[in-house]
Amino acid sequence: MSSISLIQPDRDLFSWPQYWAACFGPAPFLPMSREEMDQLGWDSCDIILVTGDAYVDHPSFGMAICGRMLEAQGFRVGIIAQPDWSSKDDFMRLGKPNLFFGVTAGNMDSMINRYTADRRLRHDDAYTPDNVAGKRPDRATLVYTQRCKEAWKDVPVILGGIEASLRRTAHYDYWSDTVRRSVLVDSKADMLMFGNGERPLVEVAHRLAMGEPISEIRDVRNTAIIVKEALPGWSGVDSTRLDTLGKIDPIPHPYGEDLPCADNKPVAPKKQEAKAVIVQPPRQKPWEKTYVLLPSFEKVKGDKVLYAHASRILHHETNPGCARALMQKHGDRYVWINPPAIPLSTEEMDSVFALPYKRVPHPAYGNARIPAYEMIRFSVNIMRGCFGGCSFCSITEHEGRIIQSRSEDSIINEIEAIRDTVPGFTGVISDLGGPTANMYMLRCKSPRAEQTCRRLSCVYPDICPHMDTNHEPTINLYRRARDLKGIKKILIASGVRYDIAVEDPRYIKELATHHVGGYLKIAPEHTEEGPLSKMMKPGMGSYDRFKELFDTYSKQAGKEQYLIPYFISAHPGTRDEDMVNLALWLKKHRFRLDQVQNFYPSPLANSTTMYYTGKKPLAKIGYKSEGVFVPKGDKQRRLHKALLRYHDPANWPLIRQALEAMGKKHLIGSRRDCLVPAPTIEEMREARRQNRNTRPALTKHTPMATQRQTPATAKKASSTQSRPVNAGAKKRPKAAVGR
C-alpha cells in the first residue's frame, strides 16, 4: 500500500449540511413524471437532470450516480430521459427547476453512439429500451441545452458527461472533419463540469442553494466557464506560440576583474540594532493560482502545429496535485478551465456506491430490454481511473490517472446486494473491474512524486519505479468474493493490463485458476513498434511472457483456456507493411478475428491529434518536429481492416492488389508462409470481365461527345447505334394517292 497522499480535498464530499428538502427522504426511483412527483409530495424539483440514456438506477450509469448523490445532499432531483427534442414541451414536463438543469448526452458520446468509425449510421443503441436507434440527436449536449434555455431562459444549465468533458476546449471533430469551438461556447451553457462530477456538482448545488449567482461561482475545480479576462489574483503563462529557446547569457569569468589590494586597517565594530522578526506565510507553489494561456480557437483552427501544441499542454495539465488552470480565447471571450478535482478517497467512494440504488431500470420501461443494463447488471465496479495513458483512449483525461479504489467491505456488500435483490441472478458475477481489471489499489508509492508528476503514462515506455505493482489486495478481494455463500463463479471481463500483471505472477495464477470462463480479453493493439510507440503500448515481449505464464497456470489447473487479443487497424503511425506483418503474426498463431476495429478519432485523445495534424504530441512540438504517417482515406482504412481479417475470402482481392503494389507478391499462394491464396480461374475470368467494361482508348480525333461518355453510357450508345433507326416504332399507314 502507498503512503498517505499529499493530494487532499478542502472538505469531505459528505460534510456539507443537508438542504432542507432532505425531510422528504430518498425516492424509490428519481421521478420522471409529474405523477411520480405528486406521489412523493413534491411541488417542484430543485434540480432536473436531462440525459440521452434510458434511466437505469444503477451505479454504472452516470445520471443515477449524480441523481442519488444530490439526493443524499437533500435536494429533490428529477430525471428527463431521452426527451423528444423536436420542441421544448418534453423539457417542461417536470416543471421549472429551482436551482439548475444538468445536461448530458449519456454514458457515451452521442456521435460515437450514432456512427461507426467509417462514419456509417448505426442501427441500434444499447442505452435505449429494446435497442432502438434514433432516440437521441446528434451532438445531444448542444440540442438539449438549447431546448432547456428555450423552456426556462432564466434557469442555469450545467453540462456534464463524457461528450461535454472531451469537448471542453477547441477540438477536432472527426464527423465534420474540422476544428470546432468548445462545447461550452457553442451551447451557451452557464458552466461545464468535466470528468467525474461528484465534487463540483455537490459544491455548486449547495452554493446555488445558498443564493450565490452562478455567474459568481468561478473557482470550483473540475469546471469550465466563460470569462472576459483572467480571474483576479491569478498570474498567467503565455503559451500561445511554440516554445523557443531564450537568450543564454555568457558565464562570467571568475578571474576576469582585478580585485583591490587588502587593507589591514582595523575596522570599528558596527553598532548592532535589534531587528523585527518577520513571519512570512508559506511560499506559494509554482502551479498555484497560475494559468496557461493556450493558442486561441482561431489559431488552432488555422494552424495544425499550434493545435498539436495546445493538445500537448492540455494533456500535461491533468494531475490534480500540480495542474494549472487553462485559458483559451474564442472570439472576444475566453474559456477558463479550472484544475481537475481532487480524487475521491476510499471512504468517499464507499459512500457513493452505498447510495440507495435499485439496480434496475425505471418501472416506466416495463418489460423492455436495455442491452447496456443487461451487460452490467451482475457486475461490480471496484475502482476508477487509469494510469496506462494509451494515446487512443480518453479515460485518463476523463477519470484521471490516480486510481480511486473502493474498500473490500464495500465491494462485498454490493455482491451480497446483487445476490439478494437483483432479479434473475444465477450465482455468477460477470465482472469485478473497472477501466482496467488489475489496477485495484495500485498507486504511486511516493506521495511527492504523485503530487508533482506530469508523465502521460506510469507504465510507458517502462513501468515507473514509484508505481506499486503488488496485486495482493486484488488477490485477497477475489478470494473473499468467491467464498461468499450463493456465489458460484466470479468472472473477470474487464481488460487485463498484462505488462503490469507479469510483475506479479501470483495474480496471473489466481486469474487463470479461478476467474476465466474459457477466454480472457487482453489488448496488445498491434505487434509492430511503429504504431505501438504512437499508441504508448508495450511491445510484444510483455504479451509473450504473459501468455507463457497464463498457459502454464491454466495447464496446472487442468483447464483449456485461451487469450483473445484485440487489435486496432489504421491507427496513426501504421503503414501498410505494419498491417501485413500483423496479419502474418495472426496467421502464424492461428487467430481468426471476427470483430475488428478501425481507429476511431474521438475528441481529446492524443491519437486524434496525430490523425488530424500529422504531428506527435507525445514529444515537443515544432514546425520541423517529428511527423507521423496517418493512414487516411476510405481505401487505405478498408485495406488495414481487411488485413486483420485476412482469412475472409471477400477481402482477398483487395489484399492481393495491395501485396502486388508493395512488391510482396511472394505472400500470395498456397504455401504455408503465404498470407492469401492465389486467385482461382473463375476469379480471374470475373476480373477480365470487369476490365472489359472500361473506357475505350481516346485520341485527339475522338469526338467530344464520345470523350465525355462513361462506360455505361458508351455501352448504351453503341447498342442504340446498332439498332435500326425506326426499330420499335409503329409503322405509319401509307398516304393515300392523290392527297
From Swiss-Prot:
Cofactor(s) needed: [4Fe-4S] cluster
Start and end residues of each Radical SAM core domain: 372-650
Alphabetized GO MF terms: 4 iron, 4 sulfur cluster binding; catalytic activity; iron ion binding
InterPro entries registered for this protein in UniProt: Elp3/MiaA/NifB-like_rSAM, Methylthiotransferase_CS, rSAM, rSAM_horseshoe, UPF0313, UPF0313_C, UPF0313_N
Coiled-coil stretches noted in the UniProt entry, renumbered to this chain: none
Similarity comment text for this entry: Belongs to the UPF0313 family.
Protein name per Swiss-Prot or TrEMBL: UPF0313 protein YgiQ
Protein source organism: Shigella flexneri
Gene from which this protein is expressed: ygiQ
